[in-house]
Amino acid sequence: MDPKISEMHPALRLVDPQIQLAVTRMENAVGRDQNNVGPKVYPIILRLGSPLSLNMARKTLNSLEDKAFQLTPIAVQMTKLATTEELPDEFVVVTVK
């Protein structure tokens, strides 16, 4: 695993086994998917207690695969108010298993 990406923090509860989460700074995540082989990066601003969906992600979709993946809900909720250290820049990297 990339040392720039931390393990999923307890502040996030991941329900869907088909999706993995990693917390990282956006500048570390951008560029990892340039050849469409790496993880798909979706910057998401987290809201306490709110389920997130990829429809909330701000990403330019340039392939049908991305469009299909965007419609898949991310079963993630904030379980507590996270600090900046726990969720740097409030961005999450979402990848498909």
Curated annotation (Swiss-Prot):
Domain 9b per the UniProt entry, residue ranges: 8-97
Compartment list: Host cytoplasm; Host mitochondrion
Key word Phosphoprotein present: no
GO BP annotations, alphabetical order: negative regulation of defense response to virus; negative regulation of mitochondrial fission; positive regulation of autophagosome assembly; symbiont-mediated suppression of host cytoplasmic pattern recognition receptor signaling pathway via inhibition of MAVS activity; symbiont-mediated suppression of host type I interferon-mediated signaling pathway
Primary localisation category: host cell
Keywords, comma-separated and alphabetical: Host cytoplasm, Host mitochondrion, Host-virus interaction, Inhibition of host innate immune response by virus, Inhibition of host MAVS by virus, Inhibition of host RLR pathway by virus, Viral immunoevasion
Motif interval(s): Nuclear export signal: 45-53
GO annotation, cellular component aspect: host cell mitochondrion; mitochondrial membrane; outer mitochondrial membrane protein complex
InterPro entries with a match to the protein in the record: Protein_9b_Betacoronavirus, Protein_9b_SARS
Chain segments annotated as coiled-coil in the UniProt record: none
Record note on quaternary structure: Homodimer. Interacts with host TOMM70; the interaction occurs only with monomer.
Family to which this protein belongs: Belongs to the coronavirus group 2 protein 9b family.
Other information: The open reading frame (ORF) encoding for this protein overlaps with the N ORF.
Function: Plays a role in inhibiting the host innate immune response by targeting the mitochondrial-associated innate immune response. Acts by binding to host TOMM70, inhibiting its binding to HSP90AB1 thereby disrupting the interferon activation pathway.
Protein's recorded name: ORF9b protein
Organism whose genome encodes this protein: Severe acute respiratory syndrome coronavirus 2
